[in-house]
Curated annotation (Swiss-Prot):
SUPFAM superfamilies: Ribosomal protein S7. GO terms for cellular component: small ribosomal subunit. HAMAP family: Ribosomal_uS7_B. Keywords: Ribonucleoprotein, Ribosomal protein, RNA-binding, rRNA-binding, tRNA-binding. This is Small ribosomal subunit protein uS7. The gene is rpsG. It comes from Methylobacillus flagellatus (strain ATCC 51484 / DSM 6875 / VKM B-1610 / KT). Belongs to the universal ribosomal protein uS7 family. The keyword Lyase does not apply. Part of the 30S ribosomal subunit. Contacts proteins S9 and S11.
Length: 156
């Protein structure tokens, strides 16, 4: 790692439709190849689907899903005396949200529905209810940290 000055955090503008910074960040996570308008169309379409299917406010479902997906602990590899140990470490708040959004996107991409909007809507609804592939991923990470609790004294 370079020992230069710390890079300042970029200020992400809130999303124009919902006025939420979290939605804006998720659009950026969803975006591929710099096509932001396509990512926005997909997300807003998913939000419309959520409102139709669940009858709840789409933004509420989204924030609940993200908060359900945030991991508390994760494991990091650390080399000690010729052996690699999976050391459980607490996740920083900014990274919690970033991981939750990435897991949500990846889980939605792996689903079987026809369009990405439908996949994302279904995954968001499931995550807000505490089930689905993204929740499974978070549980798996927590399980790994629990299993390697014995190595927690190898702090970073």
């Amino acid at each position: 790692m370079p020992r230069r000055r710390e890079v300042p955090k970029r200020n992400i503008l809130p999303d124009p439709k919902f006025g939420s910074q979290e939605v804006s960040k998720f659009v950026n996570v969803l975006m591929t190849g710099g096509k932001k308008s396509v990512a926005e169309r997909i997300l807003y379409g998913a939000f419309d689907q959520i409102t139709q299917k669940s009858g709840k406010e789409a933004l509420e479902v989204f924030t609940l899903a993200i908060s359900n997906l945030r991991p508390v602990v994760e494991v990091k590899s650390r080399r000690v005396g010729g052996a690699n140990y999976q050391v459980p470490v607490e996740v920083r708040p900014a990274r919690r949200s970033a991981l939750a959004m990435r897991w949500l996107r990846d889980a939605a991409r792996k689903r079987g529905e026809k369009s990405m909007g439908l996949r994302l809507a279904a995954e968001l609804i499931e995550a807000s209810e505490g089930r689905g592939a993204a929740i499974k991923k978070r549980e798996e990470v927590h399980r790994m940290a629990e299993a390697n609790k014995a190595f927690s004294h190898f702090r970073f």
